């Protein structure tokens, strides 16, 4: 997810990085974790770690007033997204949008595209709904659920024009790297839901995770890198306050943009 400017928001940066994920907070490993028994880990991968968050009065009002229109309940059937958005347009899935400021900015910058934002934490959902109302955005819908399950159940194969995964939890301790979202089985799942020629854009402020992302994405046979290694930041991805602060301190940010190969 992209980091937003509320220092008390889910995903506010930790001491040694410029940013932190809203949908995947640094948390202690769950007791009884049996990832090692499953070499693919796909059933164990989650796009978030459960944690509490305070919903403000404004966020609650936005949820109550705008949620019925803009929040799509999770279900096991694939919705008619054209009917939901009221048009047929390029469709982008964003996994973990945090407090939603950057999501709203991208949607405003690209009014011809439709965005499905997935975020489990209610304060972030309320914050994005508030921005949707304030900016009168019609090209965003929200699913408050685990992105792994949303992708498997609610998104048709070969249907997405793009996927954004900005600043996911780096799980910086080596023994926790297996919990990182960007792993071969999940990348294969993402690629299967992209249209040929569609893009997957990841960003991180952890060099070790950037290196792993590059390795994993490069190894997927259905994807190709749009750059030699790391990509320049695309103009549509905003630079957040925390990212600017980190850059001033000499911290790096790495963008990776891959495309799904055309058949043949």
From Swiss-Prot:
Q: Which residues participate in S-adenosyl-L-methionine binding?
A: 94, 119, 146, 169
Pathway in which this enzyme or protein is active: tRNA modification; N(7)-methylguanine-tRNA biosynthesis
Keyword Isomerase, does the record have it?
no
Keywords associated with the record: Methyltransferase, S-adenosyl-L-methionine, Transferase, tRNA processing
The EC category is transferase
The segment annotated Disordered runs over: 1-39
Tell me the residue numbers annotated for binding substrate: 173, 205, 240-243
Q: Where's the active site on this chain? A: 169
Give the family, as the similarity comment puts it.
Answer: Belongs to the class I-like SAM-binding methyltransferase superfamily. TrmB family.
What name goes with this protein? tRNA (guanine-N(7)-)-methyltransferase
Q: What is the lineage of its organism?
A: Bacteria, Pseudomonadati, Pseudomonadota, Betaproteobacteria, Burkholderiales
